[in-house]
Structures are given as structure tokens and as C-alpha cells.
Amino acid sequence: MRASMLRLIRSRSSSAAPRPHLLRRAYGSESVPERKVAVLGAAGGIGQPLALLMKLNPLVSQLALYDIAGTPGVAADVGHINTRSEVAGYVGEEQLGQALEGSDVVIIPAGVPRKPGMTRDDLFNINAGIVKSLCTAIAKYCPNAVVNMISNPVNSTVPIAAEIFKKAGTYNEKKLLGVTTLDVVRAKTFYAGKAKVPVEEVNVPVVGGHAGITILPLFSQAVPKANLADEDIKALTKRTQDGGTEVVEAKAGKGSATLSMAYAGALFADACLKGLNGVPDVVECSFVQSSIITELPFFASKVKLGKNGVEEVLELGPMSDYEKQGLEILIPELKASIEKGIKFANQ
């Protein structure tokens, strides 16, 4: 089971990511760099399965699990798994510094999940404060770490983090990345089902933001090509945008998309680790500081990952008329979310 899960994590990375045999060729198992990964919010609905998946990742040598409560149990449980990384649990604000010190990658799934009837403002007001506090600690204890932001609303929490790091004098736009991988995972799954092609062969870039209409899957660039009707493309786009709501409703108020989000977060963290370790041509979609759209200081698109985090923000490429229209529609909403985050951070 362990071997199959490891294969799954590796095989579902971006099509540009190297296969395991290429990874071994790049550096032997005995010379894989030491990498510490910290998960903040590790006892939560996303944090626990994410901790499990990161424990299975052979690129991780130290796994630090932090939360305000419950982490010793999660760490003890995950720590019994016979993989490379050493696991330590940290609980409470007084131990946050220990969890962060020496981290190469910090993953932040901390915060409250979305519940039925919860507005975006409700979610923002709670999670924004949590992110602000955690990023203040990151700036102090591991200012050079690559930060993977999962906490929603990502369209606002990434700008919040950027402002906190700027105030601390530690901001590096190459090392702050909003995790939008779940949108890509969903787009691939839904496209494969409609096009009737093997899902492991599918690649679909998703650009824009990470909420509602700001999520813009570029099915015109999907691989392999399929001649889907316009109605099908519109339906696939809508389902990708509403994927989170679909899960919240299916769980009838008892949860959100925790498992698929943990999977997506593990995929993205794996890509970041490969980039840090010098594996070539690692490309993923991410919400980062960008100049692709003039009005938007942050934007999700394909990025090339490397030893410094984001090595290059890639151009959008050719888009269909439907996608161009979607891009125009999302710009004002995404701009408002970004500005809301910046305003909160500077209050």
C-alpha cells in the first residue's frame, strides 16, 4: 500500500515533472538533500491527511507538525510510519518558533473550513487573522522558506502574507505561492471523464484565482485534445469553479474538500521540493505575484519551480473566445479580493 501511494503522488505531478527514475538519476537516494517541511494546522481536516502524505514523501527528512491543539497525537500516529522523515509535533504559540526553525517549505492549511451558509466574509474574518499571525512567525523564524498557502480565501491570504513579509523586511515574491492545485486536479478529473481519456494522461492549466468565477480552466489547452462541444466546455468550467461547493453539499454540512485538498497540497509541496533540489522542468499552476495582468498584482498561472522557488511565471498562451471572456469577468472580482487582503494586513 505504501509503495502504491508513493507512486500515486509522483505520477500525478505536472506532466513536466520528472518521473521517479529521472529523480534517481539526478541524485542517488543516499545523496537526497535534507529538507525540513513544516505543516501549520496539522491537526485539522486538511492537515492530518496532508501530514500523512508528506510522511510518505521520500524528499522530506524532517516533518514538523504544528497546531493550537492535537498535534502530539497526530505526530505520534504518523511518526510510526516507516519512511525516511523524522516527525515532531508542536502545540501552542510558544512552540511555533521551534516548528518553523530551519524549514525549507512551510505549508499552511490552518484555519476554519467552509460550511453551508458561510459567507466569504465570514471565512475571511477568521482565517485572515490566523494567516497574519502565522506569517509574522515565519518572517521571524524561517524567512527564507518557500511558503505554500492553502488557507482560504487564497485570493486574499496570499496578499496578506506578502504584506506581513514586506513589513518584516523578508518578502521574496519567488517564495510565496498560493496553492491552486486542487482546481487543476478537478479540471483534469472532470475533463478526462467527459473526453473519455485516461486521467493520468490529462493536463489542463487553470489560471486566475482560487474561488468561484476567478477559477479559469483553459480547456482549449487541454492535453490530450478532445473535440468537446461548447456546452460541454461551459459545463466543465462551471463544475471546476463550483467543485468546493459540490463537496460541501455532498457532505451535508459535516465537512469540506479536505481529502482532495490534502492530496493537491501534497502534490504541490512535492513539486516545490523537487524544484529546490534542482530537478529540471518542474511546472505547476500557482497563485503568485505576477505582471501577466496589469491590474492584478497576484495571479494564478503556470510557473516554473526551481532552487529559488518561482524561477519563471509563464505566459497564458492561446485562449479561446470563451476563456478570454471569462478572464475579463474575473478581473474585477479577483482585484477586489486582493485589495481586501492588502487592506486587512495594513490595519
Swiss-Prot record:
GO terms for molecular function: L-malate dehydrogenase (NAD+) activity. Its EC number is 1.1.1.37. SUPFAM superfamilies: LDH C-terminal domain-like (SSF56327), NAD(P)-binding Rossmann-fold domains (SSF51735). GO terms for biological process: malate metabolic process; tricarboxylic acid cycle. It comes from the Eukaryota. This is Malate dehydrogenase, mitochondrial. PROSITE patterns: MDH (PS00068). The active site is at H210. The gene is MDH. CDD domains: MDH_glyoxysomal_mitochondrial. NAD(+) binds at G41, A42, A43, G44, G45, I46, G47, D67, N127, I150, S151, N152, M261. Substrate binds at R114, R120, N152, R186. InterPro entries: L-lactate/malate_DH (IPR001557), Lactate/malate_DH_C (IPR022383), Lactate/malate_DH_N (IPR001236), Lactate_DH/Glyco_Ohase_4_C (IPR015955), Malate_DH_AS (IPR001252), Malate_DH_type1 (IPR010097), NAD(P)-bd_dom_sf (IPR036291). Residues 1-27 form a transit peptide. One of its GO terms (cellular component) is mitochondrial matrix. Gene3D superfamilies: Lactate dehydrogenase/glycoside hydrolase, family 4, C-terminal (3.90.110.10), NAD(P)-binding Rossmann-like Domain (3.40.50.720). It catalyses: (S)-malate + NAD(+) = oxaloacetate + NADH + H(+). Keywords: Mitochondrion, NAD, Oxidoreductase, Transit peptide, Tricarboxylic acid cycle. Homodimer. Belongs to the LDH/MDH superfamily. MDH type 1 family. It is found in: Mitochondrion matrix. It comes from Eucalyptus gunnii.
